[in-house]
């Protein structure tokens, strides 16, 4: 029998997680980062296998400057000539500085079905939002900025980014993935100094580069769908290196975060038919679990062992 669990990541996970993605980290690790791992356990063999991971980073761009392109629009019109031209533009900036980010997303696509991948993403997203809800309650303050997630963009069969080849490579010739492996996470901040600061007209780019703006890599579409179901949307910003879209939402607009509550937990011997799946986070420690539970008044009745007396909880949905 397979059961799902959530835990924090550690040094022992690095090698496996690194094998899931060529991109690597988007930022330097900080003490307040939260690294979450979803794993499935074979209860008969008593073996746990990591399945997917993400990091929750606060204060994006405050320690290391981050840049994105804003995808905008300018209009050139001459009514007397009956001309009206709308042009898409790219303007580099730091609009998401201070945001909270869902970062370093990776999944074991080789061993999980699409349905299992989707479930793992839902589980991780709910766990991350529960942690944010608990922290906001403790601090009696709301973190500034939106919640964002930068998705990988399109690459051709040779592994090259058409967008980078059409724009960035004119200013820095090396492939972005190779550059990140050579120089680490700071290379994006450094390379931004070489890229144009003035608006770039998308019509000046090759067709393949234009077509890649805001498009998601096929292998990341499951993650995109999970973000959309959670309440995030495309925010008219893309990554510098591959034009992958940045999804965003104000924290107060996320249904899962608004539904998170601090609830008393009690144990029942068996879950009734109406019980649903809930994600629980212990009030005092970073201990999550997935449990079948029933909402009774303001409290939760949890089937099996109720290890927590008080927990932050949200329906899995």
What are these regions (language model features)?
Residues 5-17:
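A short beta-loop-alpha structural element at the N-terminal edge
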Residues 27-37, 41:
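A short helix-loop-beta-strand connector motif used in the catalytic cores of GNAT acetyltransferases and
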Residues 37-39, 45-58, 101:
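Conserved beta-strand in the GNAT
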Residues 56, 101-110, 142-160, 215-216:
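Conserved beta-strand-loop-alpha-helix junction that forms the acyl-donor binding cleft
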Residues 57-104, 108, 184-185:
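Conserved acyl-donor/pantetheine-binding loop and adjacent beta-alpha core of acyl/acetyltransferases
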Residues 112-133:
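Conserved acetyl-CoA-binding loop-helix of GNAT-fold acetyltransferases
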Residues 171-280:
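Long, charge-rich C-terminal accessory regions
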Residues 281-316:
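Short beta-strand-centered segments at strand-helix junctions
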């Amino acid at each position: 029998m397979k059961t799902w669990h959530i835990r924090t990541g550690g040094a022992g996970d690095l090698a496996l997680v690194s094998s899931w993605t060529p991109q690597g980290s988007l930022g330097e690790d900080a003490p307040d980062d939260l690294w979450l791992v979803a794993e499935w356990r074979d209860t008969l063999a008593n073996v746990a296998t990591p399945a997917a991971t993400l990091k929750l980073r606060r204060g994006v761009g405050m320690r290391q400057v981050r840049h994105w392109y804003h995808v905008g629009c300018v209009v050139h019109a001459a009514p007397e000539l009956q001309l009206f031209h709308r042009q898409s533009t790219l303007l580099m900036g730091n609009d998401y500085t201070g945001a909270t980010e869902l970062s370093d997303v990776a999944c074991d696509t080789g061993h999980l079905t699409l349905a299992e991948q989707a479930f793992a993403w839902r589980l991780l997203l709910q766990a991350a939002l529960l942690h944010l809800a608990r922290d906001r309650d403790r601090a009696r303050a709301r973190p500034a900025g939106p919640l964002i997630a930068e998705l990988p963009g399109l690459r051709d069969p040779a592994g090259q980014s058409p967008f980078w080849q059409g724009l960035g490579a004119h200013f820095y010739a090396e492939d972005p993935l190779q550059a990140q492996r050579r120089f680490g996470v700071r290379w994006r901040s450094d390379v931004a100094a070489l890229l144009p600061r003035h608006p770039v007209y998308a019509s000046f780019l090759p067709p393949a580069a234009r077509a890649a703006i805001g498009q998601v890599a096929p292998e990341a579409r499951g993650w995109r769908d999970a973000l959309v179901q959670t309440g995030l949307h495309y925010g008219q910003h893309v990554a510098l290196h591959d034009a992958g879209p940045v999804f965003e939402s104000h924290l107060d607009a996320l249904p899962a975060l608004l539904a998170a509550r601090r609830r008393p937990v009690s144990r029942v011997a068996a879950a009734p038919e109406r019980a649903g799946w809930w994600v629980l986070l212990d009030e005092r420690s970073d201990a999550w679990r997935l449990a079948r539970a029933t909402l009774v008044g303001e409290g939760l009745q949890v089937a099996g062992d109720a290890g927590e007396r008080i927990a932050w909880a949200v329906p899995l949905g």
